[in-house]
Amino acid sequence: MSSTKDIDALIDLMAKLPGLGPRSARRTVLHLIRKRSLLLIPLADTLQTVAETARECLNCGNVGTTDVCDICTCEKRANGELCVVEDVADLWAMERSGIFKGRYHVLGGTLSALDAVGPQELRIPRLLDRVPSEGITEVILALNATIDGQTTAHYIADNLEGQVRLTSLAQGVPIGGELDYLDDGTITAAMRARKSF
C-alpha cells in the first residue's frame, strides 16, 4: 500500500478542477501540505462548511447559503429588470461590475442539440413563469456570444416576444467571449450600450 495514497487521491481530485491539470494539481497540493496550518486546515474546514451549507437560490439559481439569495430579497433592487445569464459565474461577473441594479435569472447552461440539452434541462420554464408573475418589464439577455448562447437567447426571445422589452448586451462582449473572463469596465460598457433583441 502506498504511503501517499491519500495525497494522490487529493491530487487526482484537484486535477478535475477547471484550470488545473495533473502537474498544477500536484504543485498546489504540495504547497497546501507545506502550509498546513495556514492554508490546508482552514481550506478543509471551509470546504466542509460550504459542502453543508451551499445551495441554489430557489428563485433565481444563484449560489448562496440561504434558500433565497440576498439579491432576490434586496428591496433596493429594480424589480422590473431581469438579467438572464448562463451560470452563476456570469452573475458574479455582472455584480462585480456594479452596473446592474435589477434581479437575475441563472439558466444553468445553454440549449445544445449536440449535448441533448433542451429547455426543460435548464431554468427556462421558471424564467417564462417569472416574467409575468413578478411584473418584469425588461429582460436583458446577457448570454455568452457563442452559438449555443445565441440559440438560447433566440429561444427565450421567441417565447417572450410581445410580453416584455427584450434587450441584449452590446459593445464590449467579443464574439465567442464569456462574461466570466471580461473585466469590469468591459461589462459596464456592454451593459450601458445594450440594445433591443
From Swiss-Prot:
Keyword Signal: no
SMART domains for the chain: TOPRIM
Protein name: Recombination protein RecR
Cross-referenced Gene3D superfamilies: 3.40.1360.10, RecR Domain 1
Stretches assigned to the Toprim domain: 80-174
UniProt keywords, alphabetically: DNA damage, DNA recombination, DNA repair, Metal-binding, Zinc, Zinc-finger
Gene name of the record: recR
Family matches, as Pfam families: RecR_C, RecR_HhH, Toprim_4
Positions annotated as zinc finger (C4-type): 57-72
SUPFAM superfamilies registered for this protein in UniProt: Recombination protein RecR
HAMAP family: RecR (MF_00017)
